[in-house]
From Swiss-Prot:
It comes from Listeria monocytogenes serotype 4a (strain HCC23). Homodimer. The keyword Isomerase applies. CDD domains: OAT_like. This is Glutamate-1-semialdehyde 2,1-aminomutase 2. It catalyses: (S)-4-amino-5-oxopentanoate = 5-aminolevulinate. Its main location: cytoplasm. Belongs to the class-III pyridoxal-phosphate-dependent aminotransferase family. HemL subfamily. The keyword Cytoplasm applies. The gene is hemL2. Keywords: Cytoplasm, Isomerase, Porphyrin biosynthesis, Pyridoxal phosphate. One of its GO terms (biological process) is protoporphyrinogen IX biosynthetic process. It holds the Pfam family Aminotran_3.
């Protein structure tokens, strides 16, 4: 039985000075009816809270830590950089070195601009798309998260292709009116949207694997269809690979699915655990960004040496063979979960992509946000708390992706399967 007394005390103190006691909403554990666990340190595939409880970590800071916690080479790279100075506000050579590595590995990127978050990357890419095409509307997909930029916090209305409605107080109707939303994996819905608004659409922004409704891969023809649509209408195709970049494949999701967008947004892995974002693409488009062009974007800490060194050392270490191992381990997890859920009579649907996977407590195949929402959320809450008590740290939301690192092995997978079996036995008998 885990003891959380120090975490509970820390949360009470945090709520006095932070909104809801956290700096990002999902960390509050509200969706699992629990108080958040405060972490102290991590090593490899494991993370330890301030009460001394150790967990196998499948959150990995929401994806960035593909090499696991406290990778010695990454820690050394950060330390060496910090000893020289944490930030200069000038160009440094390491920015160029990381940019070269990104360009080498991401098929669509010819030029890349470093920023400080995934949200900043998607906001900047959309501004660039609007400036480049001289159009204003953006098409996105229901249930996909592209950061907290105002124009992207939009909820779909009724019908196949609708103009958006604000999904958060503070988002104006004017911004929402320029956002078109259709269901993920619905190429026919996208076609209808283009038939109605095609000459006004600056860009389609899409996660090539949706990671914020759980993990939902594209169905056959979806990404290819978007590529064809945007090309035919003179719109840009933006892949939001903040989560999937270097997670799905050595060459990111676009390399795995062999679909090349006009612009790509990155984050998470390319910062090695430090704040980072990037957007890049075709030279002719990227050269419209200041100072080469007139579309403005800037940032005080963009390309800061700590994040650049951490990111370079992380990406440098990854090999094509790592992704073979990821797929083998996740297949082992999938087969084990499937066998146990059938034996324990727990409905379960599993999706996977590279080093990411998602599971839903439903009999339905999950291909979009509507089918993701058929998952038994009440069961998930109980399941989550029980798994946490057995030392398995998962995202505290049904609608988040699950990650592994190069430090996860069959040992961790098998321990997790044992915990899953015990949990299902407790909850379902």
């Amino acid at each position: 039985m885990q003891i959380y007394s120090k975490s509970e005390k820390a949360f009470k103190e945090a709520k006095k000075v932070l909104p809801g006691g956290v700096n990002s909403p999902v960390r509050a554990f509200n969706s699992v009816d629990a108080s958040p666990v405060f972490m102290d340190h991590g090593k490899g595939a494991y993370i330890t809270d301030i009460d001394g409880n150790e967990y196998i970590d499948y959150v990995l800071s929401w994806g960035p830590l593909i090499l696991g916690h406290a990778n010695p080479s990454v820690v050394q790279a950060i330390t060496n950089a910090a000893m020289k100075g944490t930030s200069f506000g000038t160009p440094t050579e390491i920015e160029t070195e990381l940019a070269k590595l990104v360009i080498e590995r991401v098929p669509s990127i010819e030029i890349v601009r470093m920023v400080s978050s995934g949200t900043e990357a998607t906001m900047s890419a959309i501004r660039l798309a609007r400036g480049y095409t001289k159009r204003e509307k953006i098409l996105k997909f229901e249930g996909s998260y592209h950061g907290h930029g105002d124009s992207l916090l939009i909820k779909a209305g009724s019908g196949v292709a609708t103009l958006g409605l604000p999904d958060s107080p503070g988002v104006t109707k004017g911004l929402a009116a320029d956002t078109i939303t259709v269901p993920y994996n619905d190429i026919e819905g996208a076609k209808l949207a283009f038939e109605k608004y095609g000459e006004e659409i600056a860009a389609v922004i899409v996660e090539p694997v949706a990671g914020n409704m759980g993990v939902v891969p594209p169905i056959e023809g979806f990404l290819e269809g978007l590529r064809e649509l945007t090309t035919n209408y003179g719109s840009l195709l933006i892949f939001d690979e903040v989560m999937t970049g270097f997670r799905v494949d050595y060459y990111s999701a676009q390399g795995y699915y062999v679909v090349t967008p006009d612009l790509t947004c990155l984050g998470k892995v390319i910062g090695g655990g430090l704040p980072v974002g990037a957007y890049g693409g075709k030279k002719e488009i990227m050269e419209q960004i200041a100072p080469a062009g007139s579309i403005y974007q800037a940032g005080t800490l963009s390309g800061n040496p700590l994040a650049m060194n951490a990111g370079f050392e992380t990406v440098r270490q990854l090999t094509p063979q790592d992704y073979d191992v990821f797929r083998t381990l996740i297949k082992r997890m999938e087969e084990g979960l499937t066998e146990i859920s059938a034996r324990r009579q727990v409905p379960l649907s599993i999706n996977k992509a590279g080093s990411m996977f998602g599971f839903f407590f439903t009999d339905q195949k999950v291909t979009n946000f509507d089918t993701a929402k058929t998952s038994d959320l009440e069961f998930f809450r109980s399941y989550y708390r029980e798994m946490l008590g057995q030392g398995i740290f998962l995202p505290p939301s049904q609608f988040e992706g699950v990650f592994i690192s190069t430090m996860h092995t069959e040992k961790e997978i098998d321990k997790t399967l044992d915990a899953f079996d015990t949990t299902c036995k407790i909850l379902r008998g």
